Amino acid sequence: MQPTNPNQFTEKAWEAIAHTPEIAKQHQQQQIESEHLMKALLEQDGLASGILTKAGVNLQKISDRTEQYIQRQPKVSGNSTSVYLGRSLDTLLDRAEAHRKDFQDEYISIEHLLLAYPKDDRFGKGLFQEFALDESKLKNIIKQVRGSQTVTDQNPEGKYQSLEKYGRDLTEAARKGQLDPVIGRDDEIRRTIQILSRRTKNNPVLIGEPGVGKTAIAEGLAQRIVAGDVPQSLKDRKLISLDMGAMIAGAKFRGEFEERLKAVLKEVTESGGNIVLFIDEIHTVVGAGATQGAMDAGNLLKPMLARGELRCIGATTLDEYRKYIEKDAALERRFQQVYVDQPSVEDTISILRGLKERYEVHHGVKISDSSLVAAATLSSRYISDRFLPDKAIDLVDEAAARLKMEITSKPEELDEIDRKILQLEMEKLSLQKESDAASRERLERLEKELADLKEEQRTLNTQWQSEKDVINKLQSVKEEIDKVNLEIQQAERNYDLNRAAELKYGNLTDLHRRLEATERELSQTQGTGKSLLREEVTEADIAEIISKWTGIPISKLVESEKEKLLHLEDELHHRVIGQDEAVTAVADAIQRSRAGLADPNRPTASFVFLGPTGVGKTELAKALASYMFDTEDALVRIDMSEYMEKHAVSRLIGAPPGYVGYEEGGQLTETIRRRPYAVILFDEIEKAHPDVFNIFLQILDDGRVTDAQGHTVDFKNTIIIMTSNIGSQYILDIAGDNSRYDEMRHRVMEAMRNSFRPEFLNRIDEVIIFHSLDKKELRQIVQLQVERLKARLDDRKISLRLSDVALDFLAEVGYDPVFGARPLKRAIQRELETQIAKAILRGEFNDGDTIFVDVQNERLSFSRLPVEVFSS
């Protein structure tokens, strides 16, 4: 048979035949024989390889034998490029045609070509005998692969074993112990089994938020099927997870995707209810593969789902269910909903305890029970935009991975010594070139130091290696225990009770003894001195990971805050001068809240700061952020003068749907979602439009607000401060006259009531009035500002000293009761900082000098102090 007509062959078969002349030319041969076709088939990595692998043939070996046979054939030298068909290939194609007729196929396919080889006297017969393959064995394997399919088009290979190609057998994975244990979720699994046992519409769809464990329920069902813990209707069934991505990938031509899907569905229905299909992210089925006028995958599924021919479990999130499946009422009615809710913190702890062993074996570390409790409680409290148990499992996983990374990388102490040795070695090399006495003396000292360091390095290296070896030994023992437990389960499933008992009371007991001995060895190794490696995940590790995720300082999560809260007032007094009443009121409110006496559903504290400009309102907010949350970055400052129009409220919580900027979220809500622990400063609130205050009502009362995209943003851990200049003229009127304080407070509060609505004022914890500053307080502020300048000069190793007269001079120059401390800042910049900068640039002061500042002729004078004066 001359292979001249590609229409007689399937695409893959013709591809292999068309490749044979190329192979012959590569080997300088003019005659194309059956061995060239075999090489082409093996290089294809398609159906031929699959059939031979199923027959137990080593593909590498058969490929090598074919190559060796080709190499032994005569070669033709010269420039001739013509090749012609050999007799063996001609007769092989005739036999393939005969097999096609036997199978009642329309085209010659790969399997027909393979079946023709056992009778190929030239090459195939000997090759197949060597690998113990005959025609009947090949036919049986081909029937297994093809099932009931016949070759009716030129691409039949895509439909063979389509479930194997586009699906993952979850029951097989459960049998091999590849799935994580599923703890709890009994109600959801029972309801799923109940729906699967119906006669028609036996298709449950698991819907719930991302990360609550929908896929885990399907895996739990697979584990129950394997354990036989299911009703008769599901006994010995296969649960296969369909990979929609693999089905769509590479479907180049119109209808190819539908063809693949039909092949999968045909295989499922022909199994006679033996296969249950699981489609994760089932919303991808709606609209998949639909081009102009073509049917989508959802419509192909509908008839089978309604008749009960196909048992299918779907899983999707609430948003996607609403967006895709609810729109298609015909598809929705074929699925029965199983709602999967987020587990409670207690249930999450149980889930983590069940998974603990898996993670310990994978990472080779120990995970303490307290760290599991911390992961569940802290993630529930601080990570509000994700769901349990997923976020808690992620925390434990990342903390264990971080610890594993520490174990495998060099300890910090050892790394420091290595770097020090390297530095000294380089110094030694340069000193060896010098011949003076000082250099030789330094060289001797250096060599002694090097010898000591190398000795310490050797000791630490030995300790690190021994600790690492024991930890690795621990991991391998745990892995063996895991394997033996899996073997015990398999033996019990097969009712091989002798084997199960032998493993349980023999191998497993020995392994547990080895585990205890290794743990003792580790504690002895680490007990000899300071341990270099930790092998247990603790609460602190979990807290550190949460801190990295959310930006919440670790001290908030782990350390006791009592000390911090007790010293809060003192700390604020250091930074905010002259506002004792304000500082005390703020500290009291926060201490009340943190001690658990305040309402937990409201912000930690909310204040309105009233007072003239420059008296420390913003400074107190900064000091509070810095002390409570360890960084001034925790201060979220929103200037209310930018919210003077009614529509500006959309900038705080995000633009409504349909408006430009809807996707971006709001300035306030997005910031607090990313950093839930913050001090929020609304500056100059009297300048905002009255409608903007409506948003404050729910923040101050319920501690939460819903943004334009429907996310609930939690304000319960924030401290809210609003500043205003309302009534500042009354405060300035009584500057220094404490006898009129009550009268002034009454007038300021009256001004507040005239400007703001009662429902807003009623929700604020405290209205705090700031006094104007007098000269004595300004002098203290001068000292504070000078301390900051000293810190900046420290970088240049320059010291700064000011006489009392100089401090008084700066306080006098910067005193302005109307503008508070701001003119003082400008005076210090003008009189002190600028003059020092100019003197340094002129070269009057150098690094390491001490500058003494005094007053001469009603101006500041600058002089260099001798070192001995300073040291005395």
Curated annotation (Swiss-Prot):
SUPFAM superfamilies: Double Clp-N motif (SSF81923), P-loop containing nucleoside triphosphate hydrolases (SSF52540)
Region (Repeat 1): 9-73
Residue numbers spanned by region Repeat 2: 85-148
Organism, as annotated: Nostoc sp. (strain PCC 7120 / SAG 25.82 / UTEX 2576)
Annotated protein name in UniProt: Chaperone protein ClpB 2
Main location (coarse class): cytoplasm
Region (Linker): 343-551
PROSITE patterns documented for this protein: CLP_R, CLPAB_1, CLPAB_2
Role this protein plays: Part of a stress-induced multi-chaperone system, it is involved in the recovery of the cell from heat-induced damage, in cooperation with DnaK, DnaJ and GrpE. Acts before DnaK, in the processing of protein aggregates. Protein binding stimulates the ATPase activity; ATP hydrolysis unfolds the denatured protein aggregates, which probably helps expose new hydrophobic binding sites on the surface of ClpB-bound aggregates, contributing to the solubilization and refolding of denatured protein aggregates by DnaK.
